[in-house]
Amino acid sequence: VELHDARRKRRWTVDLEPFEIGATSVTTAQYAQLMGTSETGSQEPVVDINWLEAIVFCNAASINEGLVPAYIIDAGEVTWQTNASGYRLPTEAEWEYACRAGTTGPHYGPLDAIGWTANDKVEKPKEVGQKLPNAFGLHDTLGNVWEWCWDLLDPARYGEYRIFRGGGFADKSWSVRASTRRGGAPGMSHPDLGLRMARGVFDDAQAAQGWSADADSERGKITGMLPSGWTPRRY
């Protein structure tokens, strides 16, 4: 899959190993069942969930099914055990590959038919799976809610910000594209931001599916003037 970072004017290709990914975003019912929240649960995507909460949910889903949790969480620091069988957040390369399902344009079909956006004039996320799926059978990868990914957005500019992808129900149609990248602090939540889980086992503990711990570390060491025009970092 080819990725594109418009801010840095950078394109790169990632060769992916086989992986699994959810057909829909995680629903409020699924979240409530595992996490014991007070909500009764519905088929709407769970939202207002930050990145760290998404990580905790993935581990809970793994434990519930007798799988090895993908994440070690220690005092707020998260380590991905790439050789674990459990559920996890997709890397952004996995997410974009899954979203595109073999297509190369901004959408995998007519946007009004595949995703909920501002064009639909809805006031909250809709139940999952109501619009047409892509060729892989995945629903709502574009529109309805953004979905957290594992990767850092850009350590040089945004520190610990994590990527989210896909676009939400309130976003204008021009911004809801398979290549659009956004991000936020791990503790940030939003009414149109949820998650979709993935699975896959890999040999390299420091790099997998387009993510590299070494690359993040090197990028994070960059100092000095950064390009103007970027979205300010929020603390």
Name what the model sees in each region.
Residues 1-62, 143, 201:
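A short glycine-rich, aromatic-capped structural motif
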Residues 5-9, 83, 155-158, 204-207:
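Short, solvent-exposed loop/turn segments that connect beta-strands within catalytic domains
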Residues 20-22, 149, 196-198:
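Residues within well-ordered beta-strands of beta-sheet-rich folds
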Residues 211-235:
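Short, cationic low-complexity segments
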Residues 40, 51-182, 186, 191:
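Functional-site microenvironments in short loops/helix caps that host divalent-cation chemistry
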Residues 2-7, 28-30, 96-97, 172-175, ...:
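Short, solvent-exposed loop/turn elements at domain surfaces
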Residues 191-207, 224:
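Short, structured beta-strand segments at or near domain termini in extracellular proteins/domains
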Residues 70-75, 207-217:
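Short, flexible loop/turn segments with low-complexity composition
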